[in-house]
């Protein structure tokens, strides 16, 4: 005798078949889980905390060093750019003077460390060295400086300084000085980048970092370097506008 199978029973059997095929015990599905685990492992490696912490320290140090270069350059720009009255006063104070005084702790010191500098009106600056032996060196340093000043010895212990009227030639000369400062700073930044490149290469050689890690590190380093160069160029452009 044949058993009559209803459509409902056939549908239920079909559902059970498909359910068994898609069950976690199926080799295909287990393979999918293994693939997912492997993928998750790769993702975890991409965010390896050991690499991230190590490189972040290097990058922060790199950025901090570049920041110091920028700050020093900004200060040099500020001192070099000819400004009215107070600017001239600040420029003179920032001059380095070879000192022959036996009391001098170093062979070269700032003018403000070896003399009293005061401003008398907008067109006259008076310098009184603490020791008369430094007068000759101060006069020579002012004469050799890039600043448009005329210095005269009033007496044995006093120097008078008057700003010269700036000319196109003197402004162009000062612009070259500013560009020289920027070039020096750019070279310092490049040297810092080279040092960081060596550190990255060292980690790659020792296999402390993977090739992907090193690629990411170099990319971030290059981005930080480009930003630093752009900031430098912007500072130079701003300083040149005040000169020419």
Curated annotation (Swiss-Prot):
It holds the Pfam family RRF. It is found in: Mitochondrion. GO terms for cellular component: mitochondrial matrix; mitochondrion. It comes from the Eukaryota. InterPro entries: Ribosome_recyc_fac (IPR002661), Ribosome_recyc_fac_dom (IPR023584), RRF_sf (IPR036191). GO terms for biological process: mitochondrial translational termination; ribosome disassembly; translation. Keywords: Mitochondrion, Protein biosynthesis, Transit peptide. The keyword Transmembrane helix does not apply. GO terms for molecular function: ribosomal large subunit binding; translation termination factor activity. The keyword Transferase does not apply. Necessary for protein synthesis in mitochondria. Functions as a ribosome recycling factor in mitochondria. Belongs to the RRF family. This is Putative ribosomal recycling factor, mitochondrial. It comes from Schizosaccharomyces pombe (strain 972 / ATCC 24843) (Fission yeast).
